[in-house]
């Protein structure tokens, strides 16, 4: 992942619709005479799907439901009772396929860039709030607008918690990413299944902890970084930290295996 590839123009006819007003096909990286490091492509463009490309689209009849937009449809795979709704898994599969197409053309730049997008979606699918919106006994309460705002703030709070752990260079979190060994999975579908099922199994404890820590705040406003700092100073984040280490470790292990296998398949790794 530490080699350089030449930046190439986007030349693909895709079946996937984007918000063209917020989709940039030019390069964002700091290149070196038209060349860019592969690790830099993966790091830079793994955030690209959150920059607006999936917003403002009419892609699913499920957008009829309150609080559901095209970004939600493409970045989540929500389980309600025994039903799995939305297209987060298809987003991952799609960009894995596009990456393979690019590598088959010897277009390494777009091979890595499409792969970076794929990694974004599998990371989304590893997160509890991208797989569940609430416990099944309370899911009908999402019809209430105030309760939907509360749940969105819960989701945002957990996203911010991950950012908090990275900001403080939490050693256990970094160890979970760096030192978890690859966990085998036979293909992309099994990868998605194993990552999602583990995430779903941890949803209730994550959700309960977020509510326990910040319930009074969440009914009024979004949680802020300083709220985590205060809670951490009081030793109140330990349960949330431990379950998060488990979620991240599971994601890291499965993704490492997938990447190694994928890189061999496209002949980027011996």
Positions of predicted regions on the chain:
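N-terminal, motif-rich segments that launch catalysis or mediate targeting to/interaction with membranes
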Residues: 1-104, 113, 131-270
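Active-site alpha-helical segments that house and flank conserved acidic catalytic motifs
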Residues: 110-132
């Amino acid at each position: 992942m530490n080699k350089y590839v030449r930046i190439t123009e986007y030349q693909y006819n895709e079946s996937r619709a984007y918000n063209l007003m917020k989709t940039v096909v030019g390069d964002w990286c700091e290149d070196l005479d038209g060349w860019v490091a592969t690790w830099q492509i993966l790091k830079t463009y793994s955030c690209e799907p959150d920059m607006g490309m999936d917003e403002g689209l009419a892609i699913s009849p499920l957008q009829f439901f309150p609080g559901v937009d095209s970004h939600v449809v493409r970045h989540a795979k929500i389980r309600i009772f025994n039903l799995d709704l939305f297209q987060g898994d298809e987003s991952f599969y799609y960009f894995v396929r596009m990456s393979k197409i690019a590598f088959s053309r010897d277009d390494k730049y777009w091979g890595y860039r499409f792969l970076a997008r794929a990694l974004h979606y599998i990371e989304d699918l590893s997160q509890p709030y991208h797989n569940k919106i609430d416990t099944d006994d309370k899911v009908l309460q999402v019809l209430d607008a105030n309760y939907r705002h509360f749940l969105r703030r819960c989701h945002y709070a957990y996203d911010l918690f991950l950012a908090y752990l990275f900001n403080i260079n939490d050693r256990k979190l970094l160890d979970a990413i760096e030192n978890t060994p690859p966990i085998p999975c036979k293909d992309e579908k099994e990868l998605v299944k194993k990552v999602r099922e583990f995430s779903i199994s941890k949803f209730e404890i994550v959700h309960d902890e977020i509510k326990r820590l910040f319930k009074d705040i969440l009914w009024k406003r979004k949680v802020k970084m300083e709220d985590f700092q205060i809670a951490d100073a009081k030793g109140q984040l330990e349960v949330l930290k431990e379950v998060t280490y488990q979620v991240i470790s599971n994601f890291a292990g499965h993704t490492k295996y997938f990447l190694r296998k994928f890189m061999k398949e496209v002949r980027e790794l011996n």
